[in-house]
Structure formats: C-alpha cells, structure tokens
Amino acid sequence: MSKIFVDACLGKETPYTPVWMMRQAGRYLPEYMKVRAEAGNFLNLCHDPEKACEVTLQPVDIVGVDAAILFSDILVIPDEMGMDLSFVKGEGPKFSDPIKTQADVDRLIGGEEAAGKLTYVYDTIKLIKERLAEDKALIGFTGAPWTLATYMIEGQGTKTYNICKKMMYSDPELLHNILAKVTEVVKYYMEKQIEAGIDVVQIFDSWASAIEPGKYDEFSWKYMVEIADYLKSKYPDTPIIMFPKGIPAFIERGLVYGNFDVFGVDWGTPMALAKEKLGDQYVLQGNMEPCRLYSKEATTECVEAIQKVMGGKRHIFNLGHGILPDVPVENAKHFVNECHRVSGKK
C-alpha cells in the first residue's frame, strides 16, 4: 500500500498534504504520561521496546498524524559510545565525563560496534512496524553530529556553547575528530534503523544556530551531507529529511546542498524564503510556530498562510520545532485537521 507521507517526501503528487509534529509522542498526551510513569523514567522508556512502541503509536491513533516518529532520544548514541548518560529532573541530560582531549575521543566506542549496541531501538522499530497501519509511515531519526557533540563536549545542555566554541576556534582539529567519530556511528545507526524497517530518515540539527553562518558548513552541514550520501548509496529509495534549526542566513546565501529529499524549515525562517531558495531542489517541511498551538484561531491563520505560500506542492506540514508539553490535545488535533482541510483531504 502506498504511504502518502513517503510519496510526499519524494516529491510525488499526493491527494492532500500530509502532516506530523516534532515531539508528537510526548508530554502533552496524558496517555504518554501514564506509560512514562509506568516506565519509571525517560531512559527506561527509551530502553523498553514494548513501551516505546506504545508511545510511538499514540499520536497516530489519538491526533491523526500521517506518520509516526520512533520514540527514542538523540543522546542514546553517545551513551552507547561509552559516555554514561543520565537525566536529572529539572536539569535535563548530563554526561558525567565530557570530552576534553584526544585521549577522551580515543576511548569512545566507534562505528559499527557502538551502533550494534542500540538493539533496543531496532527492536522497537520492528514492533512498531508490526502494529502501524499500512498507510502510515515510520520516521527514524538521529541527531546531527554537531548537535550530539555539543552535549558530549559541554556535558549537558547549554545556552552559550562556549566550551564547544572555544574548541572550534582554538583546537578545530580536535572538534573535527569528535565530529568524524560521531558521524561514523550515525551512519551505521541509521543503516540499522532502515534495515529494521523505518520508511524515512530525519536528521535533527537542533543547535545549528549556535554556529556562525560562515562556519556552519565546515562544522555541521558537511557531516550531515556525508551521512545522507552514505545512506543514499545503499538505500536510494529511502527519503531523508534534514532539519537544521535556526540557519536563515545559510539558506538566504544559497549555501544548502546535498543528496537528500526534504528540508525542514524552522519557524524563524520565512516559508517564502525557503521556497524561493530551496523549493525547486527539495520538498519543504514545516513550519508553524509551536506556540500557535495554544490558540485554534492562530493555528488556522498560520496553516492557511503556509498553504497559500506552498500551494499544496512539494510540501509536508509540520511545526517549526517541537510541540510543547502544555498544549491541549484538542488543539493538536485541530492543527492536524486544519492541515488536511486546507490541502483538500476528502
């Protein structure tokens, strides 16, 4: 059976514009909170294929999105590379021993060995594929090497990225060595996700905006393109979505390139600009400001504006970043319904 989401990713004509939401399997859903409480904590939920499968399917069943996205976390990669991930309540993810030297890099587990330890992810994918409706697609994902490296070097989330940037400008070779090692793991990780059954790949560069535009290609984009090239060489029919958040200047200068299918547009980048610069080359995904979900009227206004720009061609509806935990479920449903309405779903 044809999957409308996969067709849309490949730029094919579809009867309406499909929609999903970043972080759609998450805290705004009471059903998710119940399963998370049963799991004990966030990491336990990631490591439990049965429960991770359940929360992956929830937004498809409850909200009506056209694709499921695997429930996991980008930081399971450095965790299995040997970095000892923990989640501290109220503070987020932490690594107890951040990378400071080449010796730290050399100690990390690399390549296929690290990717091979993520069996719980592949088991989750297989379970989801058994239970997901045939007309719905499953999105697998990874963090971009730069975004992963920020946590590995800083030891936690950061607003300034000063430790990473100090390395970028004072010891770029060390940073490139970290990025290269992470890139190799990501290649094998995404290959194994595809082999397990995902239909589409998304690469999240959540902290792309931390890099000045003139350095973005060198320290992030080229590594994302390397991953896409590797996957396309083996799985040419598997669509790849790139989502670098907060790089309008990079887009405006015409610096985006690479062998991928869909460009995810964040809410801070005008859709008209993305269409002008990228619309002929890539399908565009996005880009409603997530806080509009607090108001059904604001949601409808934005959905109609995006539809006016894109005209239902070479487009996938999404938010311009993740859905927030206190959004009413009814408003999330309204967003999905409005995306379907304006694009002509019967």
Curated annotation (Swiss-Prot):
Say yes or no: keyword Ribonucleoprotein present. no
| EC number(s) recorded for this UniProt protein | 4.1.1.37
Q: Where does substrate bind?
A: R23, Q24, A25, G26, R27, D73, Y151, S206, H321
Give Gene Ontology CC terms. Answer: cytosol
- Write down the top EC class of this protein: lyase
Q: Where is this site: Transition state stabilizer?
A: D73
Q: What is its main location?
A: cytoplasm
Q: Which InterPro entries match?
A: UROD/MetE-like_sf, Uroporphyrinogen_deCO2ase_HemE, Uroporphyrinogen_deCOase
- Fetch the Pfam families from UniProt: URO-D (PF01208)
Identify the metabolic or biological route this protein is part of. Answer: Porphyrin-containing compound metabolism; protoporphyrin-IX biosynthesis; coproporphyrinogen-III from 5-aminolevulinate: step 4/4
Location in or out of the cell:
Cytoplasm
GO:BP terms for this protein?
protoporphyrinogen IX biosynthetic process from glutamate
Q: Name one GO molecular function term.
A: uroporphyrinogen decarboxylase activity
In terms of superkingdom, the source organism counts as: Bacteria
Ordered alphabetically, the record's keywords are:
Cytoplasm, Decarboxylase, Lyase, Porphyrin biosynthesis
What residue intervals traverse the membrane? none
Q: Reaction catalysed?
A: uroporphyrinogen III + 4 H(+) = coproporphyrinogen III + 4 CO2
User: Which protein family is named in the record?
Assistant: Belongs to the uroporphyrinogen decarboxylase family.
Q: What does this protein do?
A: Catalyzes the decarboxylation of four acetate groups of uroporphyrinogen-III to yield coproporphyrinogen-III.
**What PANTHER family does the entry give?**
METHYLTETRAHYDROFOLATE:HOMOCYSTEINE METHYLTRANSFERASE RELATED, UROPORPHYRINOGEN DECARBOXYLASE
Subunit info? Homodimer.
* Protein name per its UniProtKB record: Uroporphyrinogen decarboxylase
The gene name on file is hemE
